Amino acid sequence: MRLFRVLLLSAVAFALSPAQADERSIQRLTQLLDRAQTLTARFSQLSLDGSGTQLQETSGEMALKRPGLFRWHTDAPQEQLLVSNGKTVWLYDPDLEQVTVRSLDQRLTHTPALLLSGDLSKIGENFEITHKEAGGVVDFILKPKSKDTLFDNLRLSFRDGVVNDMQLIDGVGQRTNILFFGVKMNQSLDAAQFDFKVPEGTDVIQE
């Protein structure tokens, strides 16, 4: 799954215990995420290996709606569509005429898109979180509490209260950088775009 296999302490936090600092960061992140009940944006994505060599560069558009609905469409020539209605995930590759269908893993550490669209009460259960804030930019570092994850470290940044970019680092040092632009929040979204109808002639793989 190319999109998903693929957020430092604030000055005041140094005067707090780790638990207090973490709680402040959880509250701040929840506050920012809760501002967007729906979100649409264009994105550009760059994947690098541990030495910094570029592996892949893609772009596309995304849409999110609480709770747990998301749609990520990667543009051609590496077109791919990832859709979830909150219960089921479809990963469609038109070039291969193939769709993989699976139940949505509700663990935030397995589905980073749920950080933006899922149950905010689960964030503190899944991650150790720190943050710093300066000049309208808020950077969060999220480290999974479980070892059974798709990434070791995730950075999520907001600019002027709007999500700006995300970086995921996996166990071998591979980095996936995602930049969001043209972000629009709290607009009415058609629920149909978070469902998927399998095109005729498409191979279906059920996982």
UniProtKB/Swiss-Prot annotation:
Its GO CC terms? Answer: outer membrane-bounded periplasmic space
Q: Give the UniProt record's GO annotations in the biological process aspect.
A: lipoprotein localization to outer membrane; lipoprotein transport
Q: Principal place where this protein is found?
A: periplasm
Entry's Gene3D superfamilies?
Lipoprotein localisation LolA/LolB/LppX
Q: Which InterPro entries match?
A: LolA/LolB/LppX, OM_lipoprot_carrier_LolA-like, OM_lipoprot_carrier_LolA_Pbac
Q: What's the domain of life for this entry? A: Bacteria
Record field: transmembrane: none
Q: Where is the signal peptide?
A: 1-21
Assembly notes: Monomer.
> What does it do?
Participates in the translocation of lipoproteins from the inner membrane to the outer membrane. Only forms a complex with a lipoprotein if the residue after the N-terminal Cys is not an aspartate (The Asp acts as a targeting signal to indicate that the lipoprotein should stay in the inner membrane).
Q: Which family does it belong to?
A: Belongs to the LolA family.
Checking HAMAP family in the record gives:
LolA
Protein name per UniProt: Outer-membrane lipoprotein carrier protein
Organism name: Azotobacter vinelandii (strain DJ / ATCC BAA-1303)
